[in-house]
Amino acid sequence: MNHVLAKSLISVVAAVSTLGLAQAQSAAENPATPAPKHEKQAPKVERNLKVFDNLDFDVFSNQKWDRLKESHSDDIVVTWPDGHETKGLGHHTEDLKAMFVFAPDITIKEHPIRFGSGTWTSVTGVMTGTFTKPMPIGDGKTIPPTGKRFAIGMATIGHWQGKTMDHEWLFWDNQDFMKQLGLSN
């Protein structure tokens, strides 16, 4: 009887794995070696890290765009993974909104690595979502959704002036992102 039960369990695990439900799509979600526990930082840095946690986990993930001013200055400079820069909170907000057009379920749920010094903070995270809506590419053209789920390891470095960031650097692997979206090999 135990042999039959074991075979049944193995079959269920194999079936679930085939559906992609049991395994992370990328090592970013399920790293072989998790990050060490967070080390307490100076009070000012801890305050900025808490603001940043709230930014990603609540404001960004729940698209509460009117609350971006809690963490970003009006004249924020944002350097994106491809190296281009945007200036101003309004421009940055529109760029963030554009990500949710093709993947309305994007979330960031944790910052496994978070630290800083003085007016600087740095966090890592995993941005997840599903490509379920057409992706606008300009001139009224779109890329049809692939239905692919993505889990992108990302990092953000922030420079703080007072209680908000005046410059934010975003890092993730765009090639890996495109592969996970099903748009490249």
Q: Which residues fall in each region the model found?
A:
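Bacterial N-terminal signal peptides that target proteins for export
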Residues: M1-I10
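Bacterial N-terminal signal peptides
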Residues: L9-G20
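C-terminal and inter-domain tail/linker signature
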Residues: Q23-N185
